[in-house]
């Protein structure tokens, strides 16, 4: 009985302690997007550009684990062909792990730098620029996010993410991959710079304490 009581008090104390910190944040980022495959020969460099926008909301269940919902827009547009290209709109959910806490980065850097990792799934609508055909794609995303704390209410972040697209029927230039409509696994990556806004009634956020 005493063991159960001690366990209950320990869990209750942890929950109360965590409730002293904000857990929710809003994230806005923009940056570079580049296709890896598939694309027609000679097109790859033309479709890499600063046409990436990411808007998300994150909730941390604890100081290390959380979940993130996001909307992402990537525009793969040719600099040489006005009719070629695709527009990717992705809606996703990811698990977030604060690896910076394990590395004690917040302590070593005097609460200035942090490091998050994330992985999850998404639903992507790829619109072909020339024909306006929509390709519906399932996506898997993995990434790493260094953070720099501005103050208790905001932080800058640099995100590196790789996106794997399952059942992709069209190349990034907008051409059909197979006349038999056989899909492939596509891949592109994003490098973005953004800002985190910490939301809540408390002064501090779980990211840093």
Language-model-detected regions and their locations in the chain:
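Residues that define the transmembrane beta-barrel architecture of outer-membrane proteins
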Residues: 22-24, 47-53, 87-91, 111-113, ...
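Outer-membrane beta-barrel translocator domains and adjoining extracellular loop/strand segments
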Residues: 38-43, 78-84, 108, 127-136, ...
């Amino acid at each position: 009985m005493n063991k159960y009581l001690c366990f209950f008090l320990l869990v209750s104390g942890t929950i109360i302690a965590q409730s002293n910190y904000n857990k929710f944040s809003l994230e806005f980022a923009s940056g570079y997007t580049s296709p890896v495959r598939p694309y027609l020969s000679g097109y790859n460099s033309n479709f890499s550009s600063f046409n990436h926008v990411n808007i998300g909301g994150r909730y941390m269940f604890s100081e290390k684990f959380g979940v993130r919902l996001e909307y992402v827009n990537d525009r793969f547009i040719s600099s040489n062909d006005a009719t070629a290209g695709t527009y990717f709109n992705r809606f996703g959910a990811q698990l977030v792990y604060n690896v910076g806490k394990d590395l004690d980065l917040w302590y070593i850097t005097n609460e200035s730098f942090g490091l998050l990792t994330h992985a999850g799934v998404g639903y992507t609508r790829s619109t072909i620029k020339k024909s306006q055909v929509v390709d519906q794609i399932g996506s898997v995303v993995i990434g790493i996010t260094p953070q720099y704390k501005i103050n208790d209410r905001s932080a800058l972040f640099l995100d590196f993410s790789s996106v794997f697209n399952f059942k992709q029927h069209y190349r990034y230039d907008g051409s059909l991959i197979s006349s038999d409509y056989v899909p492939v696994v596509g891949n592109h990556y994003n490098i973005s710079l953004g800002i985190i806004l910490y939301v809540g009634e408390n002064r501090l956020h779980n990211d840093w304490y």
